[in-house]
């Protein structure tokens, strides 16, 4: 997708625009106009190839996220349909993501420890979502934007917690396996679907903190392993023997507990980082 559709140009009247992400089924644009700076998301179906099956849900994801953001009371949210799928427009959040903020911690020979305040700000953003009765379903470092005043939790297309109109909804089939809780992986392997939960979000946050601070995934499997093999490693509990330094060490280990009931709640995570 090299150009924005007419419906977006009419809605935003951009004076500047930049495509920042172009992947199968989705493009994201940074757009600036007289009314401010916005993120524009376009979804369209993924066509089948010899390497992957066709996917229709990517066409619905932007509108589903837009509907959820609207229900959560977010401001300046617009979404709708275009000829190949759906779109949404939402405020642009300035700042690097969690993985980039902790890049110096992962440098060879670095003695810089991950800042607990950054971890707390990520936990607080997830706590705000859980407090409204929603689970995110796709917790990963790239979805925590560390802004100058607060951390923003973005990409809510897979969130669950309330009704979504039938024409915009689709089943949850897991997320990026690096951050997928064992119970989610097990359900996806068994049935092809799963149900996001706050407990699974806690696991995802723990895995996101671990890889951002150390460079290591929580679970050990080959880098080029198929997703089914990755998920089976998660189900088998092949936890990598890596921990975070300082106060984050025991906390992240608890967040990565195999049993969901053994993980702290998000409020307990925030309290532990005060």
Describe the function of each predicted region.
Residues 24-67:
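ATP-binding glycine-rich loop module of kinase domains
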Residues 76-86:
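Short beta-strand micro-motifs within the conserved protein kinase catalytic domain, predominantly
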Residues 257-268:
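A conserved short helix/loop substructure at the end of the activation segment
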Residues 130-147:
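Catalytic-loop of the protein kinase fold
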Residues 201:
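Conserved catalytic-loop aspartate of Hanks-type protein kinases
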Residues 147-178:
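Activation segment/activation loop of eukaryotic-type protein kinase catalytic domains
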Residues 84-97:
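Conserved short submotifs of the Hanks-type protein kinase catalytic core
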